[in-house]
């Protein structure tokens, strides 16, 4: 595992750093995507990134990217990490949805959507999770049925939940059940849908952090053309894996959120630094942060060799959520009576730790629960036997389900 940049990578890093220094404001904590000013700021920033060639570094040049390497993409993410950039609004679309479209869609679809998404003109969301499915992506009940009018269109009905950014999105990719007579992994089909269709109702979920990043989405008699299908009929699981693989490859910066700001705050508080218990905690968090950094280095090494990162990356998320909980909890305690402040308008520095603290429990669910990730580590890293599956060869319609 090589921790150092090659000369070419070092030159690219310097180029990225110079551009960010000139264009991006410094920050300590992420922006709240639910705030009214987030959308216009995000679109301006995305357009600037696209114009400079940093919006989608690994995309082919024919589609507006640099044709760069995954390592260059990671380098940019590392360098952008310490800056206050409203990029999260586009991360799902550009990191997961559009790469799926580029992999399986026809040329007309790619030509229509790739450019506008890259420039921030259109926003995408991912409609996967359902209320009854839990962490089982394949337990999809949302139905897509061929219209009986001979048009070849599909009619979609169902419900999705925990859809990030749906309230801002123009389009989404949706996984549906098209054949309930076969086992659950074989009867799914993916489509893209217009989120402004009258049959699409988005209900933001109010979080205890005060924001509403996640949404319930109700789909009622939404008609889609067969040309909106992504992949073959019944190949939805295979296409979903393309999306999930790209999610894993959407690598963020090496430093966990909040660490530089917390360290600076602790150094600026002499009485805090006299606290032996706090110094011990700082040492523990440093070790965790370094462990996460070296895990990312393993990912970068794999990418530089043209390999796909392995399931070891699941370890990083488990460690990260524990780390963020401990870090934000200590930050709130250090603020004493000011720790109850949750309005950035009153004090951005005081409100940020509480936002992280109350938002962290949701991170344990997003992108794979702790339990799912531990199963992945047990089965794919440690080689332990997998859970017994009794539904492997059972038609989806015959599977037992709750009332």
Regions found by a protein language model. Name each.
Residues 50-121, 165-171, 247, 289, ...:
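Internal helix-loop-helix
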Residues 120-128:
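A short, Trp-centered hydrophobic/proline-enriched beta-strand micro-motif
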Residues 142-146:
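A structural signal for short hydrophobic beta-strand segments in well-ordered beta-sheet cores
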């Amino acid at each position: 595992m090589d921790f150092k940049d090659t000369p070419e990578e070092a030159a690219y890093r310097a180029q990225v750093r110079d551009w960010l220094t000139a264009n991006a404001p410094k920050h300590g904590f992420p922006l709240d995507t639910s705030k009214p000013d987030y959308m216009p700021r995000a679109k301006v920033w995305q357009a600037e990134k696209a114009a400079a060639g940093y919006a989608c570094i690994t995309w082919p040049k024919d589609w507006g990217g640099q044709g760069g390497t995954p390592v260059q993409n990671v380098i940019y993410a590392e360098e952008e990490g310490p800056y206050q950039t409203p990029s999260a609004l586009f991360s799902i679309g550009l990191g997961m949805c559009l790469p799926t479209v580029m992999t399986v869609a026809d040329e007309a679809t790619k030509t229509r959507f790739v450019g506008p998404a890259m420039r921030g003109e259109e926003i995408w969301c991912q409609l996967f999770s359902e209320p009854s499915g839990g962490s089982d992506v394949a337990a999809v009940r949302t139905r897509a049925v061929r219209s009986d009018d001979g048009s070849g269109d599909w009619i979609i009905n169902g419900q999705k939940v925990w859809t990030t950014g749906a309230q801002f999105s123009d389009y989404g990719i949706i996984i549906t059940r098209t054949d309930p007579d076969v086992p659950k992994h074989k009867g799914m089909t993916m489509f893209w849908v217009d989120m402004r269709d009258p049959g699409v109702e988005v209900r933001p979920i109010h979080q205890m952090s005060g924001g509403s990043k996640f949404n319930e989405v109700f789909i009622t008699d939404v008609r889609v053309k067969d040309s909106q299908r992504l992949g073959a009929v019944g190949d939805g699981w295979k296409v979903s894996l393309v999306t999930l693989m790209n999610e894993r490859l959407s690598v963020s910066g090496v430093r966990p959120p909040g660490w530089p700001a917390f360290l600076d705050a602790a150094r600026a508080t002499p009485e805090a630094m006299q606290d032996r218990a706090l110094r011990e905690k700082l040492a523990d968090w440093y070790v965790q942060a370094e462990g996460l950094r070296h895990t990312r280095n393993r990912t970068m090494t794999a990418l530089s060799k043209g390999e796909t990162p392995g399931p070891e990356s699941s370890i990083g998320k488990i460690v990260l959520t524990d780390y963020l909980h401990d870090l934000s909890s200590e930050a709130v305690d250090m603020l004493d009576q000011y720790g109850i402040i949750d309005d950035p308008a009153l004090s951005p520095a005081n409100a940020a730790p509480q936002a992280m603290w109350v938002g962290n429990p949701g991170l344990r669910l997003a992108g794979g629960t702790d339990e799912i990730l531990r199963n992945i580590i047990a089965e794919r890293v440690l080689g332990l036997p997998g859970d017994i599956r009794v539904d492997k060869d059972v038609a989806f319609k015959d599977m037992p389900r709750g009332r």
